[in-house]
Amino acid sequence: MALLQIAEPGQSAAPHQHRLAVGIDLGTTNSLVAAVRSGETATLPDELGQHSLPSIVRYTQDSVEVGALAALSSAQDPQNTIVSVKRFMGRSLADIKAGEQSFPYEFAESENGLPLFVTPQGQVNPVQVSAEILRPLIARAEKTLGGELQGVVITVPAYFDDAQRQGTKDAAALLGVKVLRLLNEPTAAAIAYGLDSKQEGVIAIYDLGGGTFDISILRLNRGVFEVLATGGDSALGGDDFDHLLQAHMQQVWQLSDIDSQLSRQLLIESRRVKEALTDAAETEAKVILADGTELTQIVSKAEFDAMIAALVKKTIASCRRTLRDAGVTTDEVLETVMVGGSTRVPLVREQVEAFFGKPPLTSIDPDRVVAIGAAIQADILVGNKPESDLLLLDVIPLSLGIETMGGLVEKVVSRNTTIPVARAQEFTTFKDGQTAMAFHVVQGERELVADCRSLARFTLKGIPPLAAGAAHIRVTFQVDADGLLSVTAMEKSTGVQSSIQVKPSFGLSDTEIATMLKDSMKYAKDDIGRRMLAEQQVEAARVLESLHAALAKDGDLLNADERGQIDATMVNVAQVAAGDDADAIKLAIEKLDEQTQDFAARRMDNSIRVAFKGQSIDNI
């Protein structure tokens, strides 16, 4: 994710005020907002010092309650208290009803089949509910940072489809907030640990949240995160640990027929017990019944481990499957990043370490790591220059192009073009019967490939064996909002294509860019001269090759004297082309062209004569 903010050579990077931007982890269970301040990245607390906001929204006749206040009423008013709305994002009502889980809400259906929650304030959709969760986070950020936000980065699960991603953007749009980027949660976690600027290799993101488990296997290559495989269980999370504890308590206390209020009370106590056992060998569980009876029991860590062992084992099985899908082994995994509050459970950390063979990264609060990564990315994208190697690129700092015959650079995307951008150009074959074409993608402002930065090489095969110049290959350069360049070459008649991805900004510093730009200005006149020479040399080679083929086929159309003159001129062109006088090469080519015009006319006449031989006027 390394991006670049550049200035013209000789100028300082334009000084500007620190722009305000935040990263938001819009979670299933809890949501957080984080920002970079004075070079330090941290989540922002509310007035009570709470960093996480429960992702819960309650609708009453007069108000909308969000977070802890809504959570207090969830047991008494479950029908109007919407929890885990993220699970409804981008899903149809039919999908929700077809699932195994039942919900206490009253649903209606929108015209396009999406779910609507029926509340005392009317029907609301998941996007509107999500906007209510975002609202206090945005307000908290603006109050803490002391100004209006220029934009936000919101994290989403890697498996979110287009509809779910668009729904997340729409939620922010309802509040008038600019979304700088939607960032995959695994990538955000990796960024938080600075893994995007470290060695290349495979990274595992083990994300055990309240309601879901996700395992993502990423490959970091030249600053680009590639998702190799994802897996997990959308119905397995810390909540399941709580339910097992609740069932254990009910069994010990011999509680059978319980109402929804007692059930919610037991669940809240189960969560507290789970959290206490993170650091303690045992803890006391306590519940007060409606008649005032106080129930207590001691729950040990060993008992809790036994309860959840099967579920933790299930997550490890998912890790094993996902690694197999990715085609990598545990030995190839450089780091394992722990995400989600449930990864605090000691048994989880022990099992993950045992499986991957190395201690997982846990130094950043697993509840906050995704928001922190999003904040780092937001600070980059909004235009701030943090004290790190991560710099902003919202324009192309150096032109992107392709090598053509003679070692010349054909620029496809010019520098200072804003991104995202797509540009296409057509190229053709140089030789008769050419069935493949090698592409060399370069970066820089100079005219010759030797003076530019090599980015990538790839080959297009399967080009029809046509005459030189007859095949048409369309080359498309596409740079996305993350600065990732995709180059695709397609032969138009067959549709055969090949492509490659590369990060143009990877490994480039401001100084290197400035040097490359200064060199392009310093050597501009020389470069143009060298380009003109190379172009004439390529043209000379093309003309000579074409003429050699024509003479081999139709040389009998010339008498000995004519053939001798043409051969002599061809030798002269070859000799002049070996020199460094572009004008002389051009004149030699023009002389050869004049000398062979009569030969070209005879070839045309002969071709027509052969084509029409034996045919009558009526058949033509």
Curated annotation (Swiss-Prot):
Q: Which GO terms describe its biological process?
A: iron-sulfur cluster assembly
Q: Does the keyword Flavoprotein apply?
A: no
Which domain of life does this protein belong to?
A: Bacteria
Q: Which GO terms describe its molecular function?
A: ATP binding; ATP hydrolysis activity; ATP-dependent protein folding chaperone; unfolded protein binding
- What keywords were assigned to this record? ATP-binding, Chaperone, Nucleotide-binding
- Family to which this protein belongs: Belongs to the heat shock protein 70 family.
User: Tell me, what does this protein do in biology?
Assistant: Chaperone involved in the maturation of iron-sulfur cluster-containing proteins. Has a low intrinsic ATPase activity which is markedly stimulated by HscB.
Q: Which NCBIfam families match?
A: HscA (TIGR01991), PRK05183.1 (NF003520)
**Listed name of the protein:** Chaperone protein HscA homolog
